[in-house]
Structure formats: C-alpha cells, structure tokens
UniProtKB/Swiss-Prot annotation:
Name of the gene: rplX
Name of protein: Large ribosomal subunit protein uL24
GO MF term set: rRNA binding; structural constituent of ribosome
Native organism: Pseudomonas syringae pv. syringae (strain B728a)
Entry superkingdom: Bacteria
One Pfam assignment: KOW
GO CC annotations, alphabetized: ribonucleoprotein complex; ribosome
Protein family membership: Belongs to the universal ribosomal protein uL24 family.
Keyword annotations of the record: Ribonucleoprotein, Ribosomal protein, RNA-binding, rRNA-binding
NCBIfam families in alphabetical order: rplX_bact (TIGR01079)
Amino acid sequence: MQKIRRDDEIIVIAGKDKGKRGKVLKVLADDRLVVGGINLVKRHTKPNPMSGVQGGIVEKEAPMHASNVAIFNGATNKADRVGFKVEDGKKIRVFKSTQKAVDA
C-alpha cells in the first residue's frame, strides 16, 4: 500500500517549489509523482500538421521524487506523515499527528 496516492493533496517540502501545494495527478513506479502546477518545465515541440499539434514552447509538469513532498493535513493546515492502521479487517492510511483517516 502506497503512502501517497493519486488525488492526494500534498505540499512540497524541498526543492525550487518548496511550500507550494497541489494535487497528485500520477504516481510512477520509481517513487516519483506528477503534481498539478508544480515542477513545471518547458518543452520545445515541433509542429506536426498531420496530428494537428501546433509547435512552440509548452509548459508541463515533470515528475518529482516522493521524498520531496509530504501529504497535507487539512485539519492542522500542515504537512504530515502517513501511517497505517487496521480497522474492521482493512488496512487504512492515517495521519501520524492526529490518527485520523486520510481518505475520510
């Protein structure tokens, strides 16, 4: 079970975007995440009239390592860590500081 999943709200704790918040768009296999509006890079694309792609400089989100982000706890308005607890025979994610369920 992963500590950070798609659609989780996270806060960046290290790097050029430190302090920014965003939603996880994609979780990649090698502990990397794509977060909306964070870690933007510019890509130069060639025009391709066959597929209708207009050329130019396109800004897009690049993957960042999961160690540079922390899950955002809305109750405390701070970054938090994730732990696991078994309730009713199911393993759930909980915030370490408040012991409340992440997916609640």
